Amino acid sequence: MAEFFDSLMEDHVEMIARQPVFFVATAAADGRINLSPKGLAGTFQVLSPTRVAYLDLAGSGNETHAHLAADGRITLMMCNFEAPALILRIYGRGRPVLPADPEWEGLAARFTLLPGVRQIFDVTVEGVQTSCGWGVPVMTLDHHRETLPRYHTAQDPEAWVKKQAGRTRSLDGLPTRATDRYIAGPTE
């Protein structure tokens, strides 16, 4: 049976911390619905019971950014692949925060930055739903993929920024803001 909450409860936060993967769904008023899996360790943070954020590394598209800039609606979903079975959905409003934005430093300090980070998605929680999850398989994590961070580590920083500057439209033609700097990863 589904239960609804106004904010994240402590048991929700504990469940989120155990998840190796989460899913992000966004849509603008018109066009495609985007659904993306995310799963690099340490990229999702619960900032408060009504605020979460996650690191976004440059990839093949930037649909989430375009949709949040146009509409703001976002749903995040986690599935407990261990016992007990549980699905948790976070409904909210999100926005992209790029390294050039004034709030970047404070938000980025909450994460260990990975090579190729282009933005952080900052989400205000408007509601939380849990459901049984009895249809979700029981699985164990073998390991996290390191391909994306390794790919970004191997890039020339100037060429990387130039490539990002050319990616300012979603699949449906919605505008995005490109990051203006290459982040190599954690600083000493």
Show where each model-derived region lies.
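Binding-site signature for planar aromatic cofactors or substrates
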Residues: M1-E188
